[in-house]
């Protein structure tokens, strides 16, 4: 949008609608990841060529497909792929296929240096204690694991135990991310989960005893949630001394139970904005510092954790004393999402693995890469993706953007920045573009405005392509827009 008034009109049209954040997928949404015939060997060779131009390290995500069954399905709100867990035989079988996928990629990652490891889901704490060493050994079958690397595992309260947490630490895992969502025992029932506040506190107590840093996810904007309930839960979790709290708005979309049957019980966007404001104030009063629109951490924690996976995901191109350095992300396993960025001048690919477990298994049984579809970045798309991600850190370094792309990020999007400056959501200096105030709550709206022109081009191109496809041709499977916080770790519904 080149006109400031057009941006203001866009904001007024959309500011009362529910938001869907872009923490994981950035730009563009997987709705536009339409390439199905991806020559993965060439993609991997292209990554190797990029590695010769910019030193590349790997953020590794290892997924687990399974979640406990709930009524309503998928905790009532989760938009992300998962399979229903029924027995440990599923996990044993899955680990065998995970190992097969690693075998296919091993030569391509020969000599690659890991930057961080994240075990996500599904629900990655469904495994038995003796399976966590095997998980780490599967990773070691492909990569050398550096000493002192950050290794995170996410899970849900009711499937943690002291023995399991101890096994996680002994196998090399250094951080736990717990998807609590609601502490209130009555509110959590809306999701069908069989968890209790006591399980949350016992898990955090075990983490402290063992010496394992932990983070907690809480959601606001829940059906029938009051401001007083939200404050009580935040204060109770903060009182445990947990080092990191992610507090994010419930995403409601698609065919989920919350979207179809509970919309009348949900707070309005204006109510959610007030919850965001109050939640931020409560957490800051409890000694937490805001580091993203959704994340709050204690800077002087007794059990420090760098949250490196998240930081590198926001800033995949950096520099150190040896020059430029890049951070690709490999999503290993069922429904894994990968970003092989290439270079700013020669962008690479984003792609996702199969989202049906039978298809994932079939591909690997046939010695085929289990990739479902993907997207090849243009230079303009890569700029938008990196801009979206850097904005998650609440500001953009203008000089670094200029060095990387040869463009000034303010001049590139003048009308958008001017409109959001008018609203008090953005400030601009010679060095930085900073998002502040209510702009942090409305960051998805800011990102939508920044990407509007390019997305319109893509929609028109897609429509023209669709017109040339016979009516009987299968349509691409829909992949949900990003829920209200990143889903490399928030996928444990």
What kind of feature is each model-predicted range?
Residues 1-61, 69, 461, 468-470, ...:
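Flexible, acidic/Gly-rich N-terminal and inter-domain linker regions that tether
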Residues 54-96:
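Canonical Radical SAM [4Fe-4S] cluster-binding loop centered on the CxxxCxxC motif
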Residues 64, 155, 435-436:
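Hydrophobic residues in beta-strands and at strand termini
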Residues 72, 76, 188-189, 402, ...:
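A short local structural element in Rossmann-fold oxidoreductases
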Residues 84-106, 115-118, 122-407:
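C-terminal scaffold of the Radical SAM
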Residues 336-493:
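Charged, E/D/K/R/S-rich low-complexity terminal regions of large eukaryotic assembly subunits
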């Amino acid at each position: 949008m080149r006109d400031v008034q057009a941006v203001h009109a866009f904001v007024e049209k959309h500011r009362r609608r529910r938001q869907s954040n872009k923490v994981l997928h950035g730009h563009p949404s997987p709705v536009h990841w339409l390439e199905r015939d991806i020559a993965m060997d060439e993609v991997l060779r292209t990554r190797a060529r990029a590695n010769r131009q910019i030193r590349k390290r790997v953020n590794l995500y290892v997924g687990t497909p399974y979640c406990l069954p709930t009524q309503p399905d998928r905790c009532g709100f989760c938009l992300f792929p998962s399979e229903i867990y029924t027995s440990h035989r599923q996990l044993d079988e899955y680990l065998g296929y995970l190992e097969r996928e690693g075998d296919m990629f091993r030569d391509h990652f020969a000599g690659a240096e890991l930057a961080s490891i994240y075990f996500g889901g599904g629900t990655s704490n469904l495994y038995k204690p003796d399976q966590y060493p095997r998980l780490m050994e599967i990773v070691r079958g492909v990569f050398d694991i550096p000493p002192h690397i950050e290794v995170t595992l996410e899970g849900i309260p009711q499937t943690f135990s002291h023995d399991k947490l101890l096994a996680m630490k002994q196998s090399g895992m250094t951080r736990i991310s717990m998807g609590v969502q609601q502490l209130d025992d009555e509110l959590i029932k809306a999701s069908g989960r069989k968890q209790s506040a006591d399980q949350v506190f016992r898990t955090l107590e075990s983490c402290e005893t063992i010496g394992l840093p932990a983070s907690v996810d809480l959601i606001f904007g829940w059906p029938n949630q009051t401001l007083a309930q939200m404050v009580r839960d935040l204060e109770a979790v903060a009182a445990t001394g947990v080092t990191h709290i992610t507090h994010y708005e419930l995403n409601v979309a698609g065919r989920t139970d919350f979207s179809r049957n509970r919309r009348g019980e949900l707070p309005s966007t204006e109510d959610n904005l007030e919850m965001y404001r109050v939640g931020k104030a409560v957490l800051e009063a409890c000694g937490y510092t805001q580091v993203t629109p959704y994340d709050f951490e204690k800077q002087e924690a007794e059990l420090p954790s760098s949250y490196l996976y998240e930081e590198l995901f926001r800033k995949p191109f950096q520099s150190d004393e040896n020059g430029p350095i890049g951070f690709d992300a490999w999503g290993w396993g069922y429904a894994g999402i990968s970003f092989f960025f290439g270079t700013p001048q020669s962008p690479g690919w984003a792609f996702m693995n199969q989202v049906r477990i039978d298809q994932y298994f079939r591909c690997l049984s046939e010695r085929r890469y289990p990739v479902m579809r993907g997207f090849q970045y243009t230079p303009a798309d890569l700029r938008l993706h990196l801009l979206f991600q850097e904005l998650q850190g609440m500001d953009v370094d203008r000089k670094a953007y200029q060095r990387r792309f040869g463009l000034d990020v303010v001049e590139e999007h003048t009308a958008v920045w001017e409109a959001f400056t008018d609203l008090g959501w953005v400030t601009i200096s010679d060095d930085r573009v900073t998002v502040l105030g209510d702009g942090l709550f409305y960051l998805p709206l800011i990102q939508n405005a920044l990407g509007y022109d390019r997305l319109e081009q893509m929609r028109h191109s897609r429509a023209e392509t669709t017109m040339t496809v016979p009516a009987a041709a299968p349509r691409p499977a829909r992949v949900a827009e990003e829920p209200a916080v990143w889903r490399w770790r928030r996928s444990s519904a």
